[in-house]
């Protein structure tokens, strides 16, 4: 091993900063530099959780990691034995960021401001002597005979900064080449395959990157008139598959959002992509999978309120606007009496409450957390060190790997965990 180890961290996001900080603590004599292609670091951390930074989750409601990590759950289970959500919670509190856990088990800084996390990471890295270079975009990696890795950067002229201020409206770029003994790729998820070219050129297999965590566009105009309505909890599923999710559902001016939809989009990411985001979604508005219990509930309403109008009694306390919409969707008049429903009407009502179908016509955005599934195949990675099996001295952390999660702080937890593991081994 050389006396002075030069380490490059490519990507100034959550995984990159965590890897750099842990590497510097474990290998204090190493020269470590974070290279970020944009003019500011930790941009995604800044906007996650609506700017409050949902940095992890208590995992109290997760019985199987596959619930949280549709892809990569086996690796995360293995790595959590070394650095899990409790370690991350303690790490930030020990580094000066008090945290709070909400009722939904999401963890935020007490300040409710993502800059508390950003300042902690940037200041800790600087204090330890980690260098930070913005406006450096990696364009090529070459293996040298002395086992170093030669990195080629496209550098935007004008000094990069941490605040995000642009140095010029039309920056001029130059090419720079630097050799390093160790390199960690922490560039996050990429929506385009060509973004992985310098890694596939080295021989890495790339799982096709496609969107995950998105909302659904719904064709039904009358349904979209219910925008702003929240129903919680519900079950969502895709008929003909085992894909399902649960949680609150938000009706928007374009269709459906909320955890019940975002979770489903994550678990069904590849299926939805293969079907060009044109599918049917089933909504169980009453969050009850036992149809017999729903039937008992409806019969109870009829017995207790035979002369009442449908509109006046809301099963399962459904929101008024949604209930009126469902009545009309069934072809019933709101003034119809409960005693007039009959067996056929009751069966239709039960079906509507438990298996209400809508046509999905494309996906919307989830601006708080842009996530892709796909990336570097885990088959190419040493699962203990996260070093490449294809290219020695090259490591990976974060969403650049084929790991992704549902919303709720799980993606950032994967960044902390994989960054920590890389920081333990990159200087060995």
List PLM regions with ranges.
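Beta1/beta-strand and adjacent pyrophosphate-binding region of the FAD-binding site
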Residues: 2-15
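Short beta-strand to alpha-helix junction loop
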Residues: 76-84, 104-123, 187-194, 217, ...
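N-terminal glycine-rich dinucleotide-binding loop that anchors FAD/FMN and/or NAD(P) in oxidoreductases
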Residues: 43-76
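Glycine-rich FAD pyrophosphate-binding loop
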Residues: 8, 24-50
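Residue-level recognition of phosphate/Mg2+-coordinating polar/acidic sites
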Residues: 40, 61-64, 81, 87-105, ...
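Predominantly flavin-linked oxidoreductase catalytic cores and closely associated redox partners
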Residues: 115-116, 120-319
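A conserved FAD-binding loop/helix module that cradles the flavin
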Residues: 187-197, 202, 402-428
